[in-house]
Amino acid sequence: MSVVSMKQLLEAGAHFGHRTRRWNPKMQPYIFTARKGIHIIDLQKTLKSIDEAYDFLKNSVMEKKRVLFVGTKKQAQQIVADEARRCGEFFVNNRWLGGLLTNFKTIKSRIDKLEQLTEYVESEEFSKLPKKEQATIRRNLEKLEKNLGGLRGMKKIPDILFIIDPKKEEIAVKEANLLKIPIIATVDTNCDPDVIDYVIPANDDAIRTIMLIVSKMADAIIEGKEGRIETLEESSEVEEEEEEKDEVIDEVDEKLEAEEKYASYAEEVEEVEEEFIPSEIEDEDEKF
């Protein structure tokens, strides 16, 4: 069963593409028809692609892969931030910084600076600074937070990118392609699908469409993390069962060892009895 329904996609306006004169011919396989100069996306393919992307994300996250949400267009900014936070992943929703992936070492130093400044602003030492210096530091912190706030805690480049509108996020796409990082993206009729690994053909301008698709990808990540926890619990249970089995085996071994010792002792007693008791009986017979 699909994770979204045809009705949900229609109500969200996911089928509306761009004007026919603005289309990318490579999107032809994903277009159903054209009406009043606007391309209509084939939602059957959208349904299938959402399911494929969902399964890919879920399974990847179960393998401890990390995801970066990217959506800097106005309609997507808040949705991307909210859903990325909900599923505990990273996001960029203000501006893609060139080199974020290909020159991550430099970006990482700026992320570290953001975290250090955040701690400093909350310290007593900061409160003792002149008001003017405090204001300057706060402005720098706000600027860093705006561009890098969604990357806090990111220690290495992400394993997967999920992008809203790859045409707008062209630099992010190029960097990911260069590093062979898989990309999932909502792809409208004016985009190039060839640079995307998991194409979700859909209207990438409508807020309701963006909300629907982004929330489903976040759900996939949450499900993957829950599956990872369940797997860990199952493996933990298996380990406990194995430990219990080992304990039982040890107890049995101890009992067998004790029985063997007892049997050996019994044999020794029998030998002693055979050796000494008959002669004692003979001596007693002689007395009588």
Swiss-Prot record:
Gene3D superfamilies: Glucose-6-phosphate isomerase like protein, domain 1, Helix hairpin bin. It holds the Pfam family Ribosomal_S2. PROSITE patterns: RIBOSOMAL_S2_1 (PS00962), RIBOSOMAL_S2_2 (PS00963). One of its GO terms (cellular component) is cytosolic small ribosomal subunit. Keywords: Ribonucleoprotein, Ribosomal protein. Residues 267-288 are annotated as: Disordered. GO terms for biological process: translation. GO terms for molecular function: structural constituent of ribosome. Belongs to the universal ribosomal protein uS2 family. This is Small ribosomal subunit protein uS2. It comes from Petrotoga mobilis (strain DSM 10674 / SJ95). The gene is rpsB.
